[in-house]
Amino acid sequence: MDFLPLFHSLQGRLALVVGGGEVALRKARLLADAGARLRVVAPQIHIELRHLVEQGGGELLERDYQDGDQPGCALIIAATDDEPLNAEVSRAANARGIPVNVVDAPALCSVIFPAIVDRSPLVVAVSSGGDAPVLARLIRAKLETWIPSTYGQLAGLASRFRHRVKELLPDLQQRRVFWENLFQGEIAERVLAGRPAEAERLLEEHLAGGLAHIATGEVYLVGAGPGDPDLLTFRALRLMQQADVVLYDRLVAPSILELCRRDAERLYVGKRRAEHAVPQDRINRLLVELASQGKRVLRLKGGDPFIFGRGGEEIDELAAHGIPFQVVPGITAASGCAAYAGIPLTHRDHAQSVRFVTGHLKDGTTDLPWQDLVAPGQTLVFYMGLVGLPVICEQLVAHGRSAQTPAALIQQGTTAQQRVFTGTLENLPQLVAEHEVHAPTLVIVGEVVQLRDKLAWFEGAREDA
């Protein structure tokens, strides 16, 4: 290990930055974030750097660097393109025992800057010892996706209660177990879900009750998106990996299901047209029952749970029984599949609005507001419209839409098995029969479909017509 990782307190202390360009600005911002007083020395100083120093009450010295600029400083940064000057700054700082960093010159540094993931007060630093800073930044980018932005609030909550917990649990091992359970339990989840006040109230109750464990379950209603696992949100992935039991439907791709916690119980509750593996009211009751047992329940739905996903019915049942829940939106099929097919749902020249329509209503009919659906300047996206497609096309034409209106079928959109077929309202049902198109398939109707010829970018199964 060439460098010992340490965290340096600069609060209220003087830090010297030699240089006035963009690199100096980046370093100065870090120093300012750490509470340092800035002294910037350079013949010319970047306007943003000038504002940063002035706002923080620092010193601007618009002249050449002088050796007398160093005394009294807690840290020195050399950020110029003048190598002899950088070397001079480094030598003088080392002679005085002042930590010094020379940008892009590890051999001249007594300290180096790591790549930083800032969730203050939680901070993660990644360093390559100056050998491969780009690699360190790439690792930091991965960490940024893995560490929720609310971890800082969680650390702050722990800080506020640290002394009280120490009084209640004087034994070090007991405290360690307490904090491990807290950071992996319901209180932490409230913070991560954006409910810090509720988390603090629960912790107060927990401490007032003598630290007795209260097992309270919760339901995570999570949108799995249209199929491509890369389209999952960070929060969706985090909840998928901590749930005790998973209830999933048939639109959840196997590759997405594999991202759930390995030892979680999995319950298939999928539905097909006129065929319910588990009736919806039973699903609602099951969510309540499992959460009442203290389990963390993941209700994983394809697309977005609030767009033709019956998510509203499920959380209505949870709310009626006082079961905590959170909802994580997903990319709905219309947005995801259209994007992967190269079909913009709105376009200044073709469509000024888009309408999402269910092709399968509660009573099994396609009794839709046809007159509204044939209005000009809009794109129609039909979910679950494959079985009723002949009626849909017939009614749109009967109510005034041209039979030559462009239309598209997108089967298993966003996945490697994606197939896209384009035609018109007149021949779309025929395309379904010719190419043996099956569910899940999205139907798009509108002038925007014709843009696919030049905007298609995703290959999929390459069986397009």
Swiss-Prot record:
Then it catalyzes the NAD-dependent ring dehydrogenation of precorrin-2 to yield sirohydrochlorin. Finally, it catalyzes the ferrochelation of sirohydrochlorin to yield siroheme. NAD(+) binds at E22, V23, P43, Q44. The active site is at D249 (proton acceptor), K271 (proton donor). In the N-terminal section; belongs to the precorrin-2 dehydrogenase / sirohydrochlorin ferrochelatase family. In the C-terminal section; belongs to the precorrin methyltransferase family. Signal peptide: none annotated. Keywords: Cobalamin biosynthesis, Lyase, Methyltransferase, Multifunctional enzyme, NAD, Oxidoreductase, Phosphoprotein, Porphyrin biosynthesis, S-adenosyl-L-methionine, Transferase. Gene3D superfamilies: Cobalt-precorrin-4 Transmethylase, Domain 1 (3.40.1010.10), Methyltransferase, Cobalt-precorrin-4 Transmethylase, Domain 2 (3.30.950.10), NAD(P)-binding Rossmann-like Domain (3.40.50.720), Sirohaem synthase, dimerisation domain (1.10.8.210), Siroheme synthase, domain 2 (3.30.160.110). GO terms for biological process: cobalamin biosynthetic process; methylation; siroheme biosynthetic process. Its EC number is 2.1.1.107, 1.3.1.76, 4.99.1.4. Pathway: Cofactor biosynthesis; adenosylcobalamin biosynthesis; precorrin-2 from uroporphyrinogen III: step 1/1; Cofactor biosynthesis; adenosylcobalamin biosynthesis; sirohydrochlorin from precorrin-2: step 1/1; Porphyrin-containing compound metabolism; siroheme biosynthesis; precorrin-2 from uroporphyrinogen III: step 1/1; Porphyrin-containing compound metabolism; siroheme biosynthesis; siroheme from sirohydrochlorin: step 1/1. S-adenosyl-L-methionine binds at P226, G302, G303, D304, I307, T332, A333, M384, G413. This is Siroheme synthase. It catalyses: uroporphyrinogen III + 2 S-adenosyl-L-methionine = precorrin-2 + 2 S-adenosyl-L-homocysteine + H(+); precorrin-2 + NAD(+) = sirohydrochlorin + NADH + 2 H(+); siroheme + 2 H(+) = sirohydrochlorin + Fe(2+). GO terms for molecular function: NAD binding; precorrin-2 dehydrogenase activity; sirohydrochlorin ferrochelatase activity; uroporphyrin-III C-methyltransferase activity. Residues 1-203 are annotated as: Precorrin-2 dehydrogenase /sirohydrochlorin ferrochelatase. The modification Phosphoserine is found at S128. Residues 217-465 are annotated as: Uroporphyrinogen-III C-methyltransferase. Pfam families: CysG_dimeriser (PF10414), NAD_binding_7 (PF13241), Sirohm_synth_M (PF14824), TP_methylase (PF00590). NCBIfam families: cobA_cysG_Cterm (TIGR01469), cysG_Nterm (TIGR01470), PRK06136.1 (NF004790), PRK10637.1 (NF007922).
